[in-house]
Amino acid sequence: MQALLFLMALLLPSGAGAEEIIGGVESIPHSRPYMAHLDIVTEKGLRVICGGFLISRQFVLTAAHCKGREITVILGAHDVRKRESTQQKIKVEKQIIHESYNSVPNLHDIMLLKLEKKVELTPAVNVVPLPSPSDFIHPGAMCWAAGWGKTGVRDPTSYTLREVELRIMDEKACVDYRYYEYKFQVCVGSPTTLRAAFMGDSGGPLLCAGVAHGIVSYGHPDAKPPAIFTRVSTYVPWINAVINTSS
């Protein structure tokens, strides 16, 4: 039951319910050039949003639960209400969901998006490095999440990119999450502070020392930390294999 509540708390974007930034601040415009804003049309025709991040000129990494009938990626954005000159809007050619993804324990919540064309790298649009397969981020590390998600449980999603600093927790802090698995997931956010990713932030990155170690996956419906992020290092071989065969 709790796993289902968690899933409801961050199943997709603004309008369907996905992670967002609570307790954070507005980002300096274009200071996170790898950030991707995903405009999604679901199989039911709903329009929702997720986050993602650019890892090569033609691939964006995000959460598998951000899948949809159609996805358009906006790169180089800060305020998504505006047609900023820095923005590059590209449709997704192919959604590649991890073959072991299961929405009920929400394991392997990772997806690659192949863009219809390669992006132009600029000061506002650039890739972010991934960890090595053996590089596990450890408890106590301070990392950053960013996104255009909700800024409060009852608030709308943000038009401008926001970010929040979060602590990596020991796996014991996520004991309430029945299906949490250390090898595949990261326990993120101190329960003593209300700082979190929330609805609309799903699929966005967790940056530790400039490296994308996590993907916003799911959390409690009231946004109380900690939350669960997909552990990127575990999936680096899969990511590389997909890119090599799909390029």
UniProtKB/Swiss-Prot annotation:
Record-annotated disulphide pairs: C50-C66, C143-C208, C174-C187
InterPro entries: Peptidase_S1_PA, Peptidase_S1_PA_chymotrypsin, Peptidase_S1A, Trypsin_dom, TRYPSIN_HIS, TRYPSIN_SER
Any single biological process term in GO: proteolysis
Signal peptide: 1-18
GO cellular component terms listed in the entry, alphabetical order: extracellular space
Active site: H65, D109, S202
The Peptidase S1 domain, residue ranges: 21-244
Propeptide: 19-20
Top enzyme category: hydrolase
EC number(s) per entry: 3.4.21.-
UniProt entry keywords in alphabetical sequence: Disulfide bond, Hydrolase, Protease, Serine protease, Signal, Zymogen
UniProt-listed Pfam families: Trypsin
Superkingdom of the organism of origin: Eukaryota
MF-aspect GO terms: serine-type endopeptidase activity
CDD domains xrefs: Tryp_SPc
Family: Belongs to the peptidase S1 family. Granzyme subfamily.
Functional summary from the UniProt entry: This enzyme, isolated from small intestine, specifically inactivates the apo forms of a certain group of intracellular pyridoxal phosphate-requiring enzymes. It has chymotrypsin-like specificity towards small substrates.
PANTHER family: CHYMASE 2, MAST CELL-RELATED, KALLIKREIN-RELATED
Protein name: Mast cell protease 2
Gene (name only): Mcpt2
